[in-house]
Amino acid sequence: MTKNLLVELGLEELPAYVVTPSEKQLGEKMAAFLKENRLSFEAIQTFSTPRRLAVRVTGLSDKQSDLTEDFKGPAKKIALDSDGNFTKAAQGFVRGKGLTVEDIEFREIKGEEYVYVTKEEVGQAVEAIVPGVVDVLKSLTFPVSMHWAGNSFEYIRPVHTLTVLLDEEEFDLDFLDIKGGRVSRGHRFLGQETKIQSALSYEEDLRKQFVIADPCEREQMIVDQIKTIEAERGVRIEIDADLLNEVLNLVEYPTAFMGSFDAKYLEVPEEVLVTSMKEHQRYFVVRDQDGKLLPNFISVRNGNAEHLENVIKGNEKVLVARLEDGEFFWREDQKLVISDLVEKLNNVTFHEKIGSLREHMIRTGQITVLLAEKAGLSVDETVDLARAAAIYKFDLLTGMVGEFDELQGIMGEKYTLLAGETPAVAAAIREHYMPTSAEGELPESKVGAVLAIADKLDTILSFFSVGLIPSGSNDPYALRRATQGVVRILDAFGWHIAMDELIDSLYALKFDSLTYENKAEVMDFIKARVDKMMGSTPKDIKEAVLAGSNFVVADMLEAASALVEVSKEEDFKPSVESLSRAFNLAEKAEGVATVDSALFENDQEKALAEAVETLVLSGPASQQLKQLFALSPVIDAFFENTMVMAEDQAVRQNRLAILSQLTKKAAKFACFNQINTK
């Protein structure tokens, strides 16, 4: 016979960004708890609103499965003394398992007998295990927590109710000074406290109190309501996935509605209006059928449709205040002079240990000079890049960006166009922030891409130089994201810029404001980001590519992909083993690896030397790998007929030199002795 378990925790309003991860965590930890306690179940469903986290287990076994465990103890010769009596070692072993020496049996393993005991544990009824759900709730982790009411404990928010039901049976459990039962809270304004009748009636009991506990159902309600408004008004409404997820975690009973604002505000840049609505007010944007922004918005109230006209007016009033600010800053910022703002950046601190934003821009400008040549920018592109680098942070001192910091770069583009700068300069100012997340949009223009790389590289090198290096999960200055951005942009544009050579060039630069330090740490940090970009590539293949001598990001990613592609083919293992043997022996070479043909003693030696001399890796990675694997028979013949470590030192070094030249060329692809072929 199976049962159904419900656990609900009622809390003060949770931050929207915490709700979904906490709901998921609760489900995962409940599943782990049941598995650990040998309780089978059919399904787990989680629930969440801003004021509750809940989980329901259906088809739950009514008792634990019985447990039979075998334990291996000491060898028989240690377990028995000369008289055949059990020693203290044997007695202590069984006592630790809660058994006696009568339970001992001997089993033979590889010719020797050992003590074994079998422990059997009869499963308990599920009712005896349910109180352990309190520990599940205690084990939840949150990004922030708080104390309340003078208590010593802390949690994400104050706890008000705990509901634990096994079918209709309630459990009177204690959690953070709250006594459990079957009482839950309805909607803050429309509902009231209610008794949950059973684990299976949970959603319906709360629905009567204007709470939709299932977030998927709430989401669908919001989408359906928006689609209805869309059809009735003949408009297009952008349902942004991130905004939708946030809104559904702000409401327990959603009702969507349309509001409006004065069309005069449409003269303000669209990005300002969209930011005001989406980022600040959590409104959905409304457009006409051609995609043109309309003076309307969609909001979702936490409640029903009663007195909705008052709610609409209130939301419109709040938005207008935001739009007034945007209109004011748009008008006033156009009176500012870009060069004046750039000069004022001398007084804006980039970081107290590093210097001003203006100094950061100057260093970035010098880096762009190096990158422009390596990226093959045209003369016109180089001119635009220099101009963009000279002014690209100016918009940080505009009123608009001061009020709406999400618009940095975006407003820079608009203000530079108004000031008569070229579209390429304006676009680069917007694009230099890209990507803004791990999978974020990348720059489209070469000028913007180079400026983005240069800005990020100076940021990384500057922070590393003053010892502000990320450790563990701690990365307050988002240096991992910046490095990932550099790597992604280089790969996307296919620029064959060797990162080790580039970093060497940057460390050779001289600045009045800062001296770059900690180069080795920077290189390791960049390699770690390339490693991350390789995704699920096997660890040994990653290590082989990263240990190679080619640090062109696009080449490294292509090499890793090519190795994975052929790793299941028949010739992969023998080819890699041949190259690995060459790599391992080449490490013994001394001095400059020059080959003297006069010292050859067999045809196989000569054949390998000639093959290595004519080897030029070219084309895509898959083709280069075929070139290297084609050497496998020649390498094998060399090893079968040649004593590499000959007694004659000159002969030995000559043979090591052949292998050294081979591995030097192969290392441009990967260090094959890092690949596991077992």
UniProtKB/Swiss-Prot annotation:
<dbReference type="Pfam" id="PF02092">
    <property type="entry name" value="tRNA_synt_2f"/>
</dbReference>
<protein>
    <recommendedName>
        <fullName>Glycine--tRNA ligase beta subunit</fullName>
        <ecNumber>6.1.1.14</ecNumber>
    </recommendedName>
</protein>
<dbReference type="GO" id="GO:0006426">
    <property type="term" value="P:glycyl-tRNA aminoacylation"/>
</dbReference>
<dbReference type="GO" id="GO:0004820">
    <property type="term" value="F:glycine-tRNA ligase activity"/>
</dbReference>
<dbReference type="GO" id="GO:0005829">
    <property type="term" value="C:cytosol"/>
</dbReference>
<dbReference type="Pfam" id="PF05746">
    <property type="entry name" value="DALR_1"/>
</dbReference>
<dbReference type="GO" id="GO:0005524">
    <property type="term" value="F:ATP binding"/>
</dbReference>
<comment type="similarity">
    <text>Belongs to the class-II aminoacyl-tRNA synthetase family.</text>
</comment>
<keyword id="KW-0648">Protein biosynthesis</keyword>
<dbReference type="InterPro" id="IPR015944">
    <property type="entry name" value="Gly-tRNA-synth_bsu"/>
</dbReference>
<dbReference type="InterPro" id="IPR006194">
    <property type="entry name" value="Gly-tRNA-synth_heterodimer"/>
</dbReference>
<keyword id="KW-0030">Aminoacyl-tRNA synthetase</keyword>
<dbReference type="InterPro" id="IPR008909">
    <property type="entry name" value="DALR_anticod-bd"/>
</dbReference>
<keyword id="KW-0547">Nucleotide-binding</keyword>
<comment type="subunit">
    <text>Tetramer of two alpha and two beta subunits.</text>
</comment>
<keyword id="KW-0963">Cytoplasm</keyword>
<keyword id="KW-0436">Ligase</keyword>
<dbReference type="GO" id="GO:0006420">
    <property type="term" value="P:arginyl-tRNA aminoacylation"/>
</dbReference>
<keyword id="KW-0067">ATP-binding</keyword>
<dbReference type="GO" id="GO:0004814">
    <property type="term" value="F:arginine-tRNA ligase activity"/>
</dbReference>
